[in-house]
Amino acid sequence: MFQGASSLNLDAKGRMTIPSRHRDALLLQCEGRVTLTKHPHGCLLFFPRPVWESHREQIAAWPMSARAWQRIFLGNASDVEMDGAGRILIAPELRSAVGMTRDVMLLGMGSHFEIWDATKLAESEAAAVANGMPDVLNDFSF
């Protein structure tokens, strides 16, 4: 399970170095083979390949009424492999689709990650706080 936030920088080629605390787990779980795809909330989803394959099968089975959503998730999916330096290449099309600049945030979300442009994540979190807690969290406490 992946958790935690990491502030990272993309290099000039659009590569992101995976933090060492996640790199070893990804090598064990999927030999560094991962899939990236676009999310409509303005981030990229980053899955270990076996996790993505399960989701891909579910998405492909959606009815024709969800065809536009299949295009978003499946049509933008990009299989990549971690290189020997622990980096993944984020395709220019994906970076552009979510407005990703050099400064990014990698968020562990359990079975997968989200990759956000750092500024967009801050804006998204501020908007969430401004909108208040959703009702589903009324009975939740730490």
Curated annotation (Swiss-Prot):
This is Transcriptional regulator MraZ. The keyword Electron transport does not apply. Forms oligomers. It is found in: Cytoplasm, Nucleoid. Its main location: cytoplasm. It comes from Janthinobacterium sp. (strain Marseille). Belongs to the MraZ family. Keywords: Cytoplasm, DNA-binding, Repeat, Transcription, Transcription regulation. The gene is mraZ. PROSITE patterns: SPOVT_ABRB (PS51740).
